Regions:
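Active-site-adjacent "gating/activation" loops or surface patches in catalytic cores
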Residues: 1-5, 13-15, 251-306, 529-534, ...
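Charge-rich, well-structured scaffold segments of protease-associated domains
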Residues: 1-15, 34-253, 331-510, 576-632
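Active/ligand-binding-proximal structured segments within catalytic/core domains
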Residues: 6, 16-29, 286-331, 376, ...
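Non-catalytic regulatory/linker segments of enzymes
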Residues: 284-306, 325-361, 534, 538
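A short beta-sheet element
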Residues: 9-10, 21-22, 542
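Low-complexity, glycine/alanine/valine/leucine- and proline-rich hydrophobic stretches
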Residues: 564-580
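Prokaryote-biased recognition of long, low-complexity C-terminal linker/tail segments
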Residues: 199, 489, 493-554
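Bilobed periplasmic-binding protein/Venus flytrap-like ligand-binding cleft at the lobe interface
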Residues: 21-32, 82-87, 556-563, 609-614
């Protein structure tokens, strides 16, 4: 696989109407599986696994397109095909209904980001400082989103002219990156030759002189700041940190965890309607609703677990049956986008600290709350496993694998999963090394025996979507939420609600013998000629519960060691041994892990970090009070 990167200048970053139009147009072109470029190049022609896009703030913005997962021999063709499609789109009437959907969706997402993302305002202020007018008038545009009302009135001709001016007919630069074994070997040999020549040029005396110079620089850099100076700026108390406070309430099976006594719980009790579904509510001051449905994988057969990546990719990108009629996936995605701010199916680790689980997530406006529950049921039970859609999903997964295999950090964690987890682990089944083998076989089987693959997927569906395997979390302003419990009735209609609730499986229950005794396998070295840096991951046993009394002390210790200009920073990053290093606590798997990120010599970075930790253990290094206060 090769790389393509395309860049062109865009409109003035200080023009809110032009910037809003650019965001909307990029969404129209490549924002989802039904957008023009994604639908043609990814879903239908299978030329790429995705079409990435973004823009950088400059006086003239810079627009970027990046098709990923492109076969090396097709790089030039795909680059040309992208512009052929863009010119074709600009030459014909646009789908103005979908364009209007994109305008409204962009506005919803902007409102959502303004509420939920700290960087939204920070980036706006920074961009105003760098590029805005000196009188501060540019920043006032942040106080309104009226530009989207204007865009709703734009005509087809205006949109097409904008597309031609800034994208389809604009001057651009295309970079095509072709992998080359010869160049990799040549670069390595050239670097070795350069170092040897430099050593010879300096000689023993020159090297010794440079070593002394380096030693003097390190000594100067390591001069400690007097404690009396640091004490002039006391660390603020934790009470000065303003958290978003939430009030919990529960319904159905969630009450087995306890029933809170508060006003929000009374609201839920009034609308519970004897619904047995496990529902956890978190009441916060928000204008939106965050919905997560957590699914366990304990009932998924071992042989079906490697199907999970395909199942998850296909979940929202497949036809459904409604009232006896087949609704094609393009219409499904279009309707989903009309009703939501965002949606996805992802691993439970990222969403709910349940790595072995699967999570369905939605962010919506309160008035769409009930509609989303209907969507969840429709995608669970009314979706159709379509051969064409499955083939497209497999093509995307396979196209992404070479890029993942060129990523040192990604491969490090993939190898870690292969060593420390057993065959029944969903995390292991979804990792790159399993996908690389299984998906190729699955693609061949789908071509020869499609009914076999479809039957496997149906079995997987039935093992996931059962009443006793569902847990739902709703984060919203519950007091203003219409029918907070009643809205979930359609989801469990017709389900067997008598079966006992299935417990969630912790990753520590899916460990291999080597996972139970980390270190017994020994050191694993994975040569990767595609990268210049090295990466390292070291695992040891750790707490297996988030309520373990050692957790607070462990958190403070890690925070202390990892502080900017702290012990690890100075010993590893400060001396050029790695771009980054740090500890990770994983109570779900029962590990404490230390990682080194982008190092010229990962072992030296590990040894330096080890020496730092040991110096605090044996008392050679002292814990500075102000540093501990900052860590807390």
């Amino acid at each position: 696989m090769g790389d393509i990167l395309i860049a062109m200048f865009g409109p003035d970053c200080n023009d809110p109407l032009q910037v809003a139009a650019l965001n909307t147009l990029l969404t129209y072109l490549a924002g989802s599986s039904v957008s023009v470029l994604e639908n043609i190049m990814v879903e239908k022609e299978e030329l790429a696994s995705s079409i990435g896009y973004w823009w950088d703030s400059r006086p003239n913005t810079v627009i970027w397109f990046q098709p990923s997962g492109v076969a090396t021999e097709k790089l030039a063709f795909v680059e040309q095909r992208l512009f052929d499609i863009l010119k074709d789109v600009a030459s014909k009437p646009l789908d103005m209904n979908y364009m209007l959907d994109c305008v409204r969706r962009e506005r919803r997402q902007l409102k959502f980001n303004a509420e939920s993302s700290g960087s939204f305002y920070a980036n706006g202020v920074i961009n105003d400082f760098l590029f805005g007018k000196r009188d501060g008038s540019t920043l006032k545009d942040f106080g309104t989103i009226s530009e989207y009302e204007k865009l709703e009135k734009w005509t087809d001709a205006q949109w097409r002219e904008f597309l031609k001016q800034w994208i389809s007919d604009a001057p651009h630069i295309s970079l095509l990156g072709t992998p080359s074994k010869e160049l990799a070997e040549k670069t390595k040999a050239s670097e070795e030759k350069r170092l040897a020549a430099r050593r010879e040029e300096l000689g023993p005396a020159g090297l010794a002189k440079l070593a002394e110079k380096l030693k003097a620089a390190i000594a100067k850099n390591d001069i400690e700041i007097p404690d009396s100076i640091l004490r002039k700026w006391p660390v603020p108390g934790v009470e000065s940190i303003h958290f978003i406070e939430s009030t919990s309430a529960r319904s159905g099976l969630a009450k087995q965890l306890g029933t809170p006594s508060n006003g929000v719980q009374k609201v839920i009790d009034r609308s519970s309607a004897d619904l047995p579904l496990f529902l956890q509510f978190e009441h916060v001051p928000t204008n939106f609703v965050h919905i997560t449905v957590l699914l366990g994988t304990s009932e998924v057969k071992t042989e079906h677990r490697p199907l999970l990546p395909l199942f998850m990719d296909n979940f929202f990108n497949t036809p459904i049956m409604q009232n006896g009629q087949k609704i094609e996936f393009e219409e499904v995605v279009t309707r989903l986008e009309q009703d939501t701010i965002s949606y996805c199916m992802t691993g439970g680790g990222r969403a709910m600290n349940d790595p072995e689980g699967i999570a369905i997530q939605f962010q919506v406006e309160p008035e769409k709350y009930a509609a989303v529950v209907e969507w969840i049921r429709a995608m669970m039970f009314d979706s159709i496993f379509d051969e064409a859609r499955l083939n497209a999903g497999l093509a995307k997964i396979l196209a992404d694998i070479p890029e993942a295999k060129r990523n040192g950090n990604s491969m490090m964690y993939a190898v870690d999963a292969m060593i420390h987890l057993e065959r029944d682990s969903s995390v292991k089944a979804r990792c790159t090394l399993v996908k690389a083998i299984y998906m190729k076989r699955l693609k061949k089987l789908l071509a020869k025996e499609p009914e076999t693959v479809l039957s496997w997927l149906e079995t997987l569906r039935k093992s996931l979507f059962t009443f006793n395997n569902l847990r739902a979390l709703v984060i919203a302003n519950v007091e203003k939420l219409p029918d907070p419990v009643e809205a979930w009735k359609p989801l469990i209609a017709g389900m067997d609600t008598k079966s006992p609730h299935l417990p969630l499986v912790k990753m520590s229950q899916r460990l291999s013998p080597d996972g139970h005794n980390p270190g017994t396998y020994g050191a694993v070295i994975v040569p990767m000629p595609t990268i210049d840096s090295s990466f390292l991951l070291s695992s040891a046993r750790g707490p297996t519960s988030p309520t373990d009394p050692i957790i607070p002390s462990l958190m403070v210790a890690i925070s202390f060691l990892e502080a900017v200009e702290g012990p690890l920073w100075v010993a590893v990053r400060g001396k050029g041994l790695a771009y980054g290093s740090g500890f990770k606590r994983d109570p779900d798997g029962g590990f404490i892990q230390f990682s080194v990120y982008r190092s010229p010599d990962a072992y030296r970075a590990f040894a330096a970090a080890k020496a730092v930790v040991e110096s605090y253990i044996n008392g050679e290094a002292k814990f500075e009070q102000h540093a501990l206060e900052g860590a807390i």
